[in-house]
């Protein structure tokens, strides 16, 4: 229950920050005020604030309080951040999502696929091509590979919605960490066919390997983004030895 409580407070504060209720550089209410507002313990508030710090929304200032350091992105961009489903990312960016499944099939990883994805050769996989729309524009082409023995009974219909919702809510899988590589690559014929690149001849590519709580890599995804709508946001902390 405490975990759900701090997570709910985190979501509420994050929404207030993203919608501008707390303006850029504004101080958040004091710890005591937040305790009264959310009827919770001091530790619960501190856990919620720590999560906001880790995600780059706020900065704690000793003796002063907590300052909002989040500046909303322009609506013409699509910002990616933590481990999120496309649906979650779209809603966080205040945009309307739609997903079209172009291909849904079952494959066995050969050496070429193994080298590309990191799955061992011989792994049984779902391979999915999905075209993601935001506010009616086709912006992202995803190539997804999921381990069949983890994403059990995955279907095209589920892929049209949210695969992560299915994994977490139906299969009770904990999605823990993701390794990402971002590159700029020349467009392919498939990119040109679906993404309406216009005068662009390249796009932003995010390749990710995602792991569950058992340390098993269950997903490899290559997301190919229209460059005029792509924005990556990270939170970096300088650590002194």
Summary of predicted features, one role per range:
Residues 54-63, 69:
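Beta-hairpin "wing" of winged helix-turn-helix
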Residues 96-241:
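C-terminal all-alpha effector/ligand-binding and dimerization domain
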Residues 4-6, 30, 67-81:
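Short, cationic-aromatic polyanion-contact patches
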Residues 49-50:
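Short, hydrophobic-biased segments on the C-terminal half of alpha helices
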